[in-house]
A protein has these predicted regions:
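Extended beta-strand/beta-hairpin segments
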Residues: 1-55, 66-145
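Alpha-helical metal-binding/catalytic segments enriched in His/Glu/Asp
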Residues: 60-61
């Protein structure tokens, strides 16, 4: 039997800097900070870790849309993805619903935009794929010329 290749997994770190604040480092060398609101013992100096999950979804699907629309030869001039969410009342207070709002600018075909959103949410966005089995994800699209 042939040896199986060894997979090296990327390492991410979260280093406590006091209070409820952490500096996170990615495997690609980038850093960001998280904190919690004052009522949770933090100083509210940065997004919470849970907010980063929702922000990650916005970024992931946004990257997909920009790429897919470029491939469809759609003249995208602007894109903003925002999220609102609901959380469970009891701990661990996970997301129960996320609603994405896509605001796009350009002379775009609405049918192609909806197709790009569907491809992102159903096929390409890994964050969406991880959340969707447990979280209701809905969306709306606004296109401005």
């Amino acid at each position: 039997m042939a040896d199986q290749p060894v997979t090296t997994l990327p390492t991410l770190t979260a280093t406590w800097t006091g209070g409820r604040r952490f500096v996170h480092r990615s495997a690609t060398g980038h850093a960001l900070v998280t904190d919690t609101p004052a009522e949770a013992g933090g100083q509210n100096t940065a997004p919470t870790p849970l907010e980063l999950v929702a922000m990650g979804l916005c970024g992931c699907t946004g990257v997909d849309l920009a790429s897919i629309l470029e491939g469809m030869r759609q003249p995208l001039r602007g894109l903003e993805v925002s999220a609102t969410y609901e959380r469970a009342a009891d701990h661990p207070r996970v997301f129960t619903r996320l609603h994405l709002r896509y605001r796009l600018q350009g002379d775009l075909d609405p049918a192609k935009v909806e197709r790009a959103v569907a491809l992102s949410q159903d096929k390409y966005c890994s964050v969406s794929a991880m959340l969707a089995p447990k979280v209701a994800i809905t969306h709306e699209v606004e296109i401005q010329p």
